[in-house]
């Protein structure tokens, strides 16, 4: 390869990446998922598009995709909070195992019939498209305001269900090559090894990497590079030992994100940019790999298979997988059924048969690509509407426009949050002494018209003021309500009810003050929170959980870390 060819590749690559970034600004205006933009640009630059680039190097695409996926999962794991595991670990694992098997099986049966394939070949297509995609889920869920149970379930499921899909795909390819039609008992042994090594090396490697980062002194810019190189090493090492590298790198990131670590916020900021670059490169490469004209040949059966996957296979897998978990409402189950987002992983898995030289490998790839495209276009674009329809959205709270970690010590949890006030903020005009700041938070600085003020308790806030608040991550919900864009009472009443009460309030006192009548005798020692938790029937509660009893809708309005702190109540026949 001469220098002119290398320069040409640099120019083409920079145009594709830069164009993807610039065009991504239109995705929200058009209501199209940003990942579709990246895929479309790759397809336009490909052999059937305006660019005319002939790219059919499957090993290179596989290399790029795996490297990108490792970075995306490392970043996603680091942003997954431990509270998410408390809320949705076991349901998510059920969906990541039983759910994937059901989805793959039902999809495989339909694929075999639609494309006239052997049952084992149909099952291979089902395995390829059987898992949801972490890149798509992390990208599309960020600003939708879903309740914690739904968000946690989707994030953990997408981060942990790829190993099952990978394992099924590799197993079925080997069976086709060897002429097998039945699984043997070694299937279970290999499955346990995949998950076991993934969990052990992921958690152990994450802990070891955290210890190294905290014990070595480096320039701040090098800590993110050390973290990402360590994560990729865990991915590669686990894969080399025939474990699940995908699960290992996700858990490695989870450990780093939930333990004290030096330069946490520098690492997170760098990871954010690296994850976006990884998504762009991965979807561009996969878009280049496909020949769009070939998709028309399988369009009708592939469309039918896509709809079967979305409307039959995925819903059945959700309802069966969540059968033991009674704390999921029907609305949540229906929403989870619809949001089975497919993304890069099915396309990457579709490369496996190409590299193995199977007879119908090109068809498998085209079908997987078509299903991903339909999933992103239909499910991705309708995600917000479906969430509102299923009523799994909770009232939003204001987020800081910027947050910076105060990395004085790895154990230091303090951060600086920046809030800017607009005319719609309810606290504009209020004196600082009237703000009910969360305990252990302080307003460190107040800027007005780009001038640093020296505020007193009597200083009144104005539109355009910028507040610098010192606090901890757990203070964000309370600060968000304090600086929300509409009066909190009106905002909360629309969702939580007419009255929002302390969960520690005595139930008998509440019934007496508000004129509530109970069919039975009220326990004098029972608090409002205990009463509602008993009605909900167990499980980890989340904000927005509600239950109708005694003619009243009881809704969890606020949680303080793991404890319910406020309950909303309204008459049951009152319109929401």
Curated annotation (Swiss-Prot):
Principal location class: membrane
Segments crossing the lipid bilayer: 6-26, 30-50, 58-78, 95-115, 122-142, 163-183, 185-205, 221-241, 270-290, 293-313, 334-354, 367-387
Superkingdom in the source lineage: Bacteria
Membrane topology: Multi-pass membrane protein
PROSITE patterns recorded: RCK_C (PS51202)
Domain RCK C-terminal intervals: 404-485
GO CC entries: plasma membrane
Coiled-coil residues: none
One Pfam family matching this protein: Na_H_Exchanger
Keyword entries, A-Z: Antiport, Cell inner membrane, Cell membrane, Ion transport, Membrane, Potassium, Potassium transport, Transmembrane, Transmembrane helix, Transport
GO molecular function: flavin adenine dinucleotide binding; potassium:proton antiporter activity
Entries under SUPFAM superfamilies matching the protein: FAD-binding/transporter-associated domain-like (SSF56176), TrkA C-terminal domain-like (SSF116726)
Location relative to the cell: Cell inner membrane
Catalytic activities: K(+)(in) + H(+)(out) = K(+)(out) + H(+)(in)
One GO biological process term: cell volume homeostasis
Job of this protein: K(+)/H(+) antiporter that extrudes potassium in exchange for external protons and maintains the internal concentration of potassium under toxic levels.
Entry's family note: Belongs to the monovalent cation:proton antiporter 1 (CPA1) transporter (TC 2.A.36) family. NhaP2 subfamily.
Protein name: K(+)/H(+) antiporter NhaP2
Top-level taxonomy: Bacteria, Pseudomonadati, Pseudomonadota, Gammaproteobacteria, Enterobacterales
């Amino acid at each position: 390869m001469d220098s002119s060819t290398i320069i040409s590749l640099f120019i083409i690559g920079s145009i594709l990446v830069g164009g993807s970034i610039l065009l991504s600004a239109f995705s929200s205006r058009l209501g199209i998922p940003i990942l579709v933009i990246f895929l479309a640009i790759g397809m336009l630059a490909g052999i059937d598009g305006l660019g005319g680039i002939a790219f059919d190097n499957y090993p290179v695409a596989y290399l790029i995709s795996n490297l990108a996926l490792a970075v995306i999962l490392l970043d996603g794991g680091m942003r997954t909070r431990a509270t998410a595991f408390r809320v949705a670990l076991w349901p998510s694992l059920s969906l990541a195992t039983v759910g994937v098997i059901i989805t793959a099986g039902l999809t495989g049966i339909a694929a075999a019939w639609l494309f006239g394939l052997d049952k084992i070949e149909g099952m291979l297509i089902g395995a390829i498209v059987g898992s949801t995609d972490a890149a798509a889920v992390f990208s599309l869920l960020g600003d939708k305001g879903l309740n914690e149970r739904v968000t946690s379930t989707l994030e953990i499921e997408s981060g942990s269900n790829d190993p099952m899909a990978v394992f099924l795909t590799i197993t079925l390819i080997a069976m086709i090559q060897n002429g097998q039609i039945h699984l043997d008992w070694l299937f279970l042994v290999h499955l346990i090894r995949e998950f076991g090594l993934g969990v052990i090396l992921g958690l152990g490697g994450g802990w070891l990497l955290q210890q190294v980062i905290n014990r070595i002194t480096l320039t701040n810019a090098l800590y993110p590079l050390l973290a990402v190189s360590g994560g990729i090493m865990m991915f590669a090492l686990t894969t080399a030992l025939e474990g699940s590298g995908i699960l290992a790198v996700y858990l490695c990131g989870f450990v780093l994100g939930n333990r004290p670590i030096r330069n946490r916020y520098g690492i997170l900021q760098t990871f954010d940019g690296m994850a976006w670059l990884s998504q762009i490169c991965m979807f561009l490469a996969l878009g280049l790999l496909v020949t769009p004209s070939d998709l028309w040949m399988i369009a009708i059966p592939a469309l039918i298979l896509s709809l079967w996957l979305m409307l039959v296979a995925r819903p059945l897998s959700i309802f069966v997988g969540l059968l033991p978990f009674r704390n999921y409402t029907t609305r949540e189950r229906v929403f989870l059924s619809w949001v089975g987002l497919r993304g890069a992983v099915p396309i990457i898995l579709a490369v496996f048969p190409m590299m193995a030289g199977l007879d119908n490998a090109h068809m498998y790839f085209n079908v997987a690509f078509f299903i991903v495209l339909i999933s992103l276009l239909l499910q991705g674009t309708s995600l917000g509407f479906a969430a509102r329809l299923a009523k799994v959205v909770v009232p939003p709270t204001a987020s800081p426009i910027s947050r910076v970690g105060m990395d004085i010590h790895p154990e230091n949890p303090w951060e600086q949050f920046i809030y800017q006030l607009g005319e719609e903020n309810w606290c504009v005009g209020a004196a600082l002494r009237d703000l009910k700041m969360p305990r252990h938070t302080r307003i460190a600085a107040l800027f007005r018209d780009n001038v640093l003020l020296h505020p007193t308790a009597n200083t009144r806030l104005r539109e355009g003021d910028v507040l610098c608040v010192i606090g901890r991550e757990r203070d964000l919900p309370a600060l968000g309500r304090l600086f929300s864009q509409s009066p909190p009472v009106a905002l909360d009443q629309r969702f939580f009810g007419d009255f929002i009460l302390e969960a520690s309030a005595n139930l008998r006192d509440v019934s007496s003050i508000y004129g509530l009548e109970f069919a039975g005798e009220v326990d004098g020692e029972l608090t409002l929170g205990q009463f509602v938790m008993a009605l909900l029937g167990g499980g980890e509660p989340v904000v927005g959980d509600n239950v109708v009893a005694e003619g009243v809708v009881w809704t969890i309005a606020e949680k303080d870390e793991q404890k319910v702190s406020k309950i909303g109540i309204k008459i049951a026949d009152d319109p929401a």
